[in-house]
């Protein structure tokens, strides 16, 4: 995610990357890893090592190699906003270590047990600049929440269940091995459909308080490298024809949620969303209604790149509140 947030920053030009911390690889390896990506292709631009710095598109970036976040001299490098993307320091206390080195704000690129969570297009307006440490929630919450918000605002969600058919990620195993958490998480990622837990649906209740306790869900990890899809099956308060649902989602995708929630009526498949920058793209042709109160809604997301673009957007939004 760190590499893709960096790509998103350079692609959009919205934020300036001034420093990167990675204790595990040297500078020349960073050049290689940033330049080549098996999923998203080669970086369209220049990247090289020069005078101990990583130089991307002519911009020199300071490199730190600290294992302890408290030792990173962010302030010296001029870094004000830190993206904590290790997946390890996800609590207020642990992520707060970055502030000791001179950072002003920390954005955790994962769900957090105690940091306030923000989803662009859903509850980002609730951010205020007294908050120093925030979470951008998970990629799945970023897919589900914008859709749930539109549906709830127009028709009311009584209750719902979410399933995400999710691409493999770095936490999984290439072949069977021991897992730190659930046993089946350790089974070979390329060979299996693996039922897994996800806090994404419950987290929607944190970013849309009216939906608290009304949604829960689970995941199936499937052997694809990237792009996932959310299935939201929910009971509606107000009766709605499926065509009405399509209409309001399309309107939202062209209006307040433009760039965050997409809409398509094409016969798409997962690969069509590789490197897509939306948080969520509603698949109008894939959803079904049992009746006017009970519907299954389908939305695609590039779980890597869409999310990384929202991290950048959240940073920009936070900076606008300074």
Swiss-Prot record:
SMART domains in the cross-refs: Gp_dh_N
Return the PROSITE patterns for the record: GAPDH
Main subcellular localisation: cytoplasm
- Crosslinked positions (Glycyl lysine isopeptide (Lys-Gly) (interchain with G-Cter in SUMO2)): 173
The positions annotated for binding NAD(+) are 22, 67, 109, 303
User: What are the EC numbers?
Assistant: 1.2.1.12, 2.6.99.-
> List-wise, which residues carry Phosphoserine?
109, 135, 138, 228, 299, 320
Q: Tell me where in this chain the PTM N6,N6-dimethyllysine is found.
A: 53, 181, 202, 214, 247, 250, 321
Residues modified as Phosphothreonine are 62, 140, 164, 169, 171, 198, 216, 224
GO terms for MF: glyceraldehyde-3-phosphate dehydrogenase (NAD+) (phosphorylating) activity; microtubule binding; NAD binding; NADP binding; peptidyl-cysteine S-nitrosylase activity
The UniProt similarity line reads: Belongs to the glyceraldehyde-3-phosphate dehydrogenase family.
What does it do?
Has both glyceraldehyde-3-phosphate dehydrogenase and nitrosylase activities, thereby playing a role in glycolysis and nuclear functions, respectively. Glyceraldehyde-3-phosphate dehydrogenase is a key enzyme in glycolysis that catalyzes the first step of the pathway by converting D-glyceraldehyde 3-phosphate (G3P) into 3-phospho-D-glyceroyl phosphate. Modulates the organization and assembly of the cytoskeleton. Facilitates the CHP1-dependent microtubule and membrane associations through its ability to stimulate the binding of CHP1 to microtubules.
The entry describes its oligomerization and partners as: Homotetramer. Interacts with TPPP; the interaction is direct. Interacts (when S-nitrosylated) with SIAH1; leading to nuclear translocation. Interacts with RILPL1/GOSPEL, leading to prevent the interaction between GAPDH and SIAH1 and prevent nuclear translocation. Interacts with CHP1; the interaction increases the binding of CHP1 with microtubules. Associates with microtubules. Interacts with EIF1AD, USP25, PRKCI and WARS1. Interacts with phosphorylated RPL13A; inhibited by oxidatively-modified low-densitity lipoprotein (LDL(ox)). Component of the GAIT complex.
- In Swiss-Prot or TrEMBL terms, this protein is called Glyceraldehyde-3-phosphate dehydrogenase
The encoding gene: GAPDH
């Amino acid at each position: 995610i760190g590499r893709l947030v960096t790509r998103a920053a350079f692609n959009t030009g919205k934020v300036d990357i001034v420093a990167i911390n990675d204790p595990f690889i040297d500078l020349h390896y960073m050049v290689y890893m940033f330049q080549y990506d098996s999923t998203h292709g080669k970086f369209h631009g220049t990247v090289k090592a020069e005078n101990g710095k990583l130089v991307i598109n002519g911009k020199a970036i300071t490199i730190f190699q600290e294992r302890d976040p408290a030792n990173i001299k962010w302030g010296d490098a001029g870094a004000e906003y830190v993206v904590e993307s290790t997946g390890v320091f996800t609590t207020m206390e642990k992520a707060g270590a970055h502030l000791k080195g001179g950072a002003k704000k920390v954005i955790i690129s994962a769900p957090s047990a105690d940091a306030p969570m923000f989803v662009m297009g859903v509850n980002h307006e609730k951010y205020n600049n007294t908050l120093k440490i925030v979470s951008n929630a998970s990629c799945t919450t970023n897919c589900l929440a914008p859709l749930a918000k539109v549906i709830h605002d127009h028709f009311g969600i009584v209750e719902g269940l979410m399933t995400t058919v999710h691409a493999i990620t770095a936490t999984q195993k290439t072949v069977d091995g021991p897992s730190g958490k659930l046993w089946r998480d350790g089974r070979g990622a390329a060979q299996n459909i693996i039922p897994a837990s996800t806090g994404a649906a419950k987290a929607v209740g944190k970013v849309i308080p009216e939906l608290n306790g009304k949604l829960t869900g689970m995941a199936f990890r499937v052997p694809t490298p990237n792009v996932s899809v959310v299935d939201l099956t929910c009971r509606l308060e107000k009766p709605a024809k499926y065509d009405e649902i399509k209409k309001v989602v399309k309107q939202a995708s062209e209006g307040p949620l433009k760039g965050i929630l997409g809409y398509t009526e094409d016969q798409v498949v997962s690969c069509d969303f590789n490197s897509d920058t939306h948080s969520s793209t509603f698949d109008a042709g894939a959803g079904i209604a049992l009746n006017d109160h009970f519907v299954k809604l389908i939305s695609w997301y590039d779980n890597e790149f869409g999310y990384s673009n929202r991290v950048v957007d959240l940073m920009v939004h936070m900076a606008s509140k300074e």
